[in-house]
């Protein structure tokens, strides 16, 4: 005796036990069910066949319309989200371009600062050399002042001698 089961259960049964275990051919009925040998159903302890419930054309149309409405809502939502994503992608690209420009500007600023630092270093070296020269010049001036002081002392002595000579 053959029993009716759904197409889905039939395919599951075929996957589970393999086609070679069936003695008969698959029989398709007009209501979407298929027939298989009852022995195979009992052997593999499958659930009893599903009873098929019929719906009217009007009920099916209502179901279809409600699904269409849900799909339209989903499509609208997805379209809006897609638009938002597209806008965000454009904003990200703009930000990347702006960030790249800022990076280049920052590089130029850093290069300028480096050049200024190099110039300041050179000026510092020159200032150090000038300070050394100033120190040497101060040393020379000190020597000259010492000589001048010595010369003044000598001149004072000479003046005293001259005064002595004149007074005589």
UniProtKB/Swiss-Prot annotation:
It comes from the Bacteria. InterPro entries: DUF16. Belongs to the UPF0134 family. This is UPF0134 protein MPN_524. It comes from Mycoplasma pneumoniae (strain ATCC 29342 / M129 / Subtype 1) (Mycoplasmoides pneumoniae).
């Amino acid at each position: 005796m053959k029993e009716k089961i759904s197409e889905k259960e039939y395919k599951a049964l075929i996957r589970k036990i393999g086609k070679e275990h069936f003695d008969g051919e698959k029989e398709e009925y007009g209501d979407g069910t298929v027939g298989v040998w009852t022995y195979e159903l009992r052997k593999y302890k499958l659930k009893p066949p599903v009873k098929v419930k019929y719906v009217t054309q009007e009920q099916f149309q209502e179901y279809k319309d409600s699904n269409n409405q849900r799909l339209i809502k989903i499509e609208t939502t997805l379209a809006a989200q897609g638009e938002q994503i597209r806008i965000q992608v454009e904003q990200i690209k703009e930000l990347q371009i702006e960030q790249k420009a800022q990076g280049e500007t920052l590089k130029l600023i850093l290069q300028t600062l480096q050049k200024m630092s190099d110039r300041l270093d050179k000026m510092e070296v020159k200032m150090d050399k000038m300070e050394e020269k100033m120190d040497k010049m101060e040393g020379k001036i000190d020597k000259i002042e010492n000589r001048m002081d010595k010369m003044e002392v000598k001149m004072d002595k000479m003046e005293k001698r001259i005064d002595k000579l004149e007074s005589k």
